[in-house]
Amino acid sequence: MAKISRRTALLGLGGVGLAGIGAVGIGLAGRTNAPAAAPPTRETPAPVSQSPTPTPKPAPKPPVDSRPRWPLTGVLLENPKKAQHPAVAVKVPDNKYEHPQRGIDEADIVFVQLEGYLDADGYSGTRLVPVFHSRMAETVMPVRSIRPVDIPLLSPIDAIIGNTGAARWVINYVKHYRKHVEGMLSYMNTRGTGSYGTDPSRVYTYQGQTYYDRATVCHPAVLAKQTKRFRKGPQQSYFPWASSSAEVSTVHGKKAKTIEVPYKGDGYRMSYAYDKKSRRYRRSMPWGPHVMADGKRIAVDNVLVIKAKQHFGKIYSGSGHDEPLHDIIDKSGTFYYANRGRYVTGTWRKGGVAKPFQFTLADGTPLKMATGQTFVELPDDGAKIRIKD
């Protein structure tokens, strides 16, 4: 810290010397005048030293961690050039009969959102959006269509979206925000490029009709080469990363051995169980452990629950039916964040489509997250989140 200069004011009053008045002799007969008395000399006061008023020291600013990091995991990045390539998100169906999946375990972030198809009770299942950047899964499957909430979720990333299409009004909505997302590289629009493929073992026939919705696969690294857009990669961190493990907000949080997030009313719960050995949360679906096609169970470093109002409707011009909507643009709500067996809660806020989420803890301090893979659950704002120690 630079030294603070101090100034000393010295007040000195210099003495004033007055010459003595000499006697004036006046020759008068018979008398002589006595010499006039010299006036008293004024005393010169001694110099006075005045102490200066101390200049208040500015409050110290917290150090800024400027080390380069992978924007979607927060992991330190030795060579920033390695991050200069597009992030690729893929739309993956998540109903029981559409499992097992591939590639989910290699994503930096996975969003869990409403699927949109209603069951007999009027409830919707879920759809996943794994996002790849620090590493690219060779194959991701199955692949399905875009939903409206993908735009505000992925615009802060400048992402390419692997998909099989969308309703006409949703396509128009995607095109409107083309500055921040590339959603036109669908299965049909990239035929012959090797960006997508078909797993013949997943093709099925129902009532004489052949279906490929469970069989479509995406190759993210190949898909990224089909455009020159977003070659510099995400230009901002998606989450507020802590500079060290000691800075992570959950260090002083409450215990969270298990987490349950409902989607269909108070049922259809996605759940997480903390594993002390790996220091990660193992994920389960409503019917059992979330396991990939290769037998690997999903386990993540961070679980982030963002509660937001869910409903169905149309928010842009064009044909097509109502789609599931999550109100996160220019909104706020409650969040829960868990890491290493502990959790904190607070308020999330999000501005416009391309603005990242902001998170504030209940005590008013900003959230600091641990680096690593993150699952983001997006239940309704009225959902009852169960966290047990």
Language-model features: where?
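N-terminal low-complexity, Pro/Thr-rich disordered segments
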Residues: I26-T73, P80
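A surface/extracellular/periplasmic glyco- and lipid-processing/surface-interacting theme
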Residues: D65-F111, L118-D389
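Flexible coil/loop interruptions and hinge/linker segments embedded within long fibrous stalks
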Residues: S5, N33-P35, H219
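A general structural signal for well-ordered secondary-structure junctions
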Residues: A19, N33-A34, H180
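N-terminal export leaders
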Residues: R6-L10
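Intrinsically disordered, low-complexity acidic regions enriched in Pro/Ser/Thr
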Residues: L11-G14, G25
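Secretory targeting signals
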Residues: M1-I4, G15-G22
